[in-house]
Amino acid sequence: MKTFRIGGVHPAENKLSSGKAIETLELPKKAVFPLSQHIGAPTTPIVKRGDVVKVGTKIAEAGGFVSAAIFSSVSGKVNKIDSVIDASGYRKPAIFIDVEGDEWEESIDRSTELVKECNLTPEEITAKIKNAGVVGMGGACFPTHVKLTPPPGCKAECVIINAVECEPYLTADHRLMLEKPEQILVGVKLLMKAAKVTKGYIGIENNKPDAIKLMTEKASIYPDIEIVPLKVKYPQGGEKQLIDAVINRQVPAPPAIPIHVGAVVQNVGTAYAVYEAVQKNKPLFERIVTVTGKSVKNPSNFLTRMGTPMSQLIEAAGGLPEDTGKVIGGGPMMGKALSNIEVPICKGSSGVLIMNDKEAARGEAKPCIRCAKCVSVCPMGLEPYLLATCSAHGDWERVENEMIMSCIECGSCQFTCPSHRPMLDYIRLGKGKVGGIIRARNAKK
């Protein structure tokens, strides 16, 4: 069975909510929309205090080509434009809306009828995706229309759909495949048409046999779409690892990107969002969020409007357990601990993980023993012990030369470290510093 060739680990899966059908969460009383929910330029608000909005009203315009518009997920009145600390831990400008009713924009098709036919050109499909504010739903939140617009000299050969969901605990993509397989496949066809390719792949790890079976059955009418079962190994959902596993091609080091080996990679949730944007005129304003944890009373998958506070999802899943040690935005490998559970759900909010005291406890960090376990598991072939040490000492020139910008921040190194070193924290610090140095250097050219 296929998998990527370098490194990888096998953390406990803990898919506690995989058997729980998607539930629609109640509307929030107030909704908060950070103006930066994607990779790229922040958006610019186009509403002001006192303005009345509906569900699907554009409230912030894209700030450039690599950016994505933001739409209201609620109807009501704009209370203020202020700032909020989001799940990343940074304070960002945001639009605050007081919710009144649930009135939708009339242009949105709210029917459940499956719409397969699309007579739009590739350029028109890409424009609709852009105008709907669709971004990568796997967490990176890269604007989807940008991936469908290859740089000069590059040509796409295939679309690869990431349905791996290798992050422990999270089950949103799994449930989406079980409940919306036909819509996903139409979305894949739309992405293929927009990318001007004739071959599509959907990579699914073999710990989801029900999803593999159902998607294979539904895809039988699309001979140009292949369902690819994959061996379970983390971080198979990484873009470069998925390309390696599915089509046996390796993406070179940055600044090379997947299109340089002919691949356009999109998350399975993105394929569904594309279907809704193109076929239903529905902008991206809601997503599926997993709320889970070993002590959580009712691990669940919620269809959640953007801007909803995470505390509302936690309450819907039974509330914070008494033995809560940490709340993570995302999963245990790549997610970040939250200091405040009132942070809003954004486009990249895939899950809320509540760890108990025992899980949350970190072992005492000790000196590196040079065991090289982190080197053996790194899926990018890096030396994480060295990157972490040099970052801790501020040796930015050294870490840049050691290819720190190739790190995908999967956390495999920290997971396997017997000395409990906070390697991912140091490497993220180093990447931030080196990224700033590179941008400043390029600005002078």
Positions of the model-derived regions?
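Hydrophobic alpha-helical positions that pack around
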Residues: V164, T198-M310, A316-P321, G331
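Acidic low-complexity segments
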Residues: I85-F142, G153, P209
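Histidine-anchored nucleotide/phosphate-binding helix
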Residues: L178-A194
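Ferredoxin-type iron-sulfur electron-transfer modules in oxidoreductases and energy-metabolism complexes
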Residues: S349-A365, V375, P379-K445
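N-terminal, Lys/Arg-enriched amphipathic/low-complexity engagement segments
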Residues: M1-I46
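Gly-rich Lys/Arg/Thr-decorated short loops/hinges at beta-loop-alpha junctions or inter-strand turns
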Residues: E105-E106, G136, V159-D173, S295
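Conserved hydrophobic positions within beta-strands
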Residues: G76-V78
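Short, well-structured beta-strand-loop connectors
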Residues: K48-E61, K80
